[in-house]
């Protein structure tokens, strides 16, 4: 089973946070601080990240399916469906699970979902890039922390959370498992049967075109002045959209 972290009162409405590549459950510090007084906040370490199990030959041979099954098993533990809040790779996994098992997810918040291109093996350029990136944290990542302080508006807690999880990434997954499989982003979005808020940068290269989203349950919001991690680049804009959405979802169910 995946490692599961939790904050807040168990009697409160549940949120499940699903992180992206090279991150972990502890890389949401500001969101957790904001939400844990009102919600039971849980977050997973995806396989090969944080304290979760490492990858092996069998799981790597079907990496996208393995990640989907990992999340399905976690959701099956909940006594009631949570609102799932997910970023990048975690967004794609959560999207696919929500399409396959809508009864396990109350609603979905997606942040710049990783876009699959139909490949079934890692791209060498991507592997090389990620390996170099993670190598920069071999000494704890002091230089990378300083770079992010110079180049971004992220809070200190977010920079620390982002940096701290890098040394716990399973490098074998980076080398052998970072492929996303079927190019199903748009079709999956339009097959969702739960309320969904999808945030992405307007100048990004992964979000669907607004005209492609024909599902009335999905609200796609493209934001200016942000990059891949919307919640860190523009936390007030992010929470100004996400918090009312979550509140409305639970209000509609009597929670």
Which stretches of residues belong to each language-model region?
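Conserved alpha/beta-hydrolase catalytic His-Asp/Glu region
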Residues: 119-124, 136-190
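Conserved HGGG/HGGXW glycine-rich cap/lid loop of the alpha/beta-hydrolase fold
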Residues: 5-54
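Conserved loop-alpha-helix segment in the C-terminal half of the alpha/beta-hydrolase fold
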Residues: 195-232
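Gly/Ala-rich beta-loop-alpha elbow adjacent to hydrolase catalytic centers
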Residues: 86, 90, 94
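Flexible "cap/lid" loop of the alpha/beta hydrolase fold
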Residues: 95, 99, 104-137
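Conserved catalytic-core motifs of eukaryotic protein kinase domains, centered on the activation segment
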Residues: 27-29, 52-59, 120-121, 209-210
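Catalytic active-site module of serine/aspartate enzymes centered on a nucleophile-bearing elbow/loop
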Residues: 217-255
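Active-site loop/oxyanion-hole signature of alpha/beta-hydrolase fold enzymes
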Residues: 33, 42-85, 240, 244
């Amino acid at each position: 089973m995946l490692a599961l972290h939790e904050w807040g009162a168990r009697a409160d409405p549940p949120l499940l946070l699903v992180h992206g590549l090279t991150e972990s459950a502890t890389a949401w510090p500001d969101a957790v601080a904001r939400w844990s007084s009102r919600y039971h906040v849980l977050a997973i370490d995806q396989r090969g990240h944080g304290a979760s199990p490492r990858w092996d030959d069998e799981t790597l041979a079907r990496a996208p399916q393995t990640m989907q099954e990992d999340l399905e098993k976690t959701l099956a533990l909940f006594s009631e469906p949570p609102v799932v809040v997910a970023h990048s790779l975690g967004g794609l996994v959560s999207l696919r699970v929500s399409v396959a098992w809508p009864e396990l997810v109350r609603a979905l918040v997606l942040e710049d979902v990783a876009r699959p291109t139909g490949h079934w093996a890692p791209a060498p350029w991507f592997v090389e890039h990620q390996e170099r990136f993670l190598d920069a944290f071999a000494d704890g990542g002091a230089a990378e922390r300083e770079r992010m302080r110079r180049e971004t508006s992220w809070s200190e807690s977010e920079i620390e959370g982002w940096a701290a999880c890098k040394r716990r990434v399973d490098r074998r997954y980076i080398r052998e498992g970072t492929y996303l499989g079927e190019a199903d982003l748009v079709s999956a979005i339009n097959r969702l049967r739960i309320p969904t808020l999808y945030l992405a940068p307007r100048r990004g290269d992964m979000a669907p075109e607004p005209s492609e989203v024909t599902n009335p349950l999905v609200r796609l919001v493209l934001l200016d002045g942000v990059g891949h991690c919307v919640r860190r680049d523009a936390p007030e804009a992010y929470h100004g959209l996400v918090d009312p959405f979550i509140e409305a979802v639970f209000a509609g169910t009597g929670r």
